[in-house]
A protein has these predicted regions:
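Short acidic-aromatic low-complexity motifs
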Residues: 1-25
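Charged/polar, solvent-exposed surface patches and flexible loops
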Residues: 5-8, 20, 44-51, 119
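Tryptophan-centered motif/residue detector
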Residues: 7, 29-30, 108
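A solvent-exposed, acidic/Ser-Thr-rich amphipathic alpha-helical stretch
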Residues: 16, 24-69
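A beta-strand edge to alpha-helix "cap/lid" segment located at domain peripheries
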Residues: 47-130
Length: 130
């Protein structure tokens, strides 16, 4: 499976192309919001989403890390509106069978500043992204 092309299709919200990456009975779990989706539900959630005042088709992003095993691809991907008015990271555990997705477990987070209590402790520093 071409993981870069998968993410390109997801970010461009191309429903027909996204569908081709999945087995018919595959599922997607979004653990941070406790949601379980069929493939069709995942496609609707992804392709019809226009939150943050962003129109469908105005999303972008970049895959920052890829780890592969025999039957799994793990990605860390940054997702943002094309105007960069918001930013999110998603860690995806993508289980494959016959080069198609059978299960995908995702963990989404909003990007932002450290919480005030940690800032007040004067610990840590910003990550230098190259």
């Amino acid at each position: 499976m071409n993981i870069q092309q998968f993410w390109s299709d997801v970010l461009a919200q191309r429903a027909d192309e996204i569908r081709e990456y999945f087995h018919a009975d595959a599922y997607v779990n979004w653990h941070c919001s406790n949601e379980h989706f069929t493939v069709e539900e995942f496609i609707r959630a992804n392709c019809e989403y226009n939150g943050y005042g962003v129109s469908v088709g105005d999303w972008d992003g970049e895959v920052e890390k890829i780890v592969t095993t025999d039957d799994m691809i793990i990605t860390a991907t940054r997702v943002y509106p094309k105007d960069r008015s918001a930013s999110f990271h998603v860690t995806s555990f993508i289980k494959l069978k016959d080069d198609k997705i059978v299960a995908m477990d995702e963990y989404w987070a909003d990007d932002g500043e450290a919480p005030k209590w940690r800032q007040d402790m004067n610990i840590g520093r910003k990550i230098d992204l190259i």
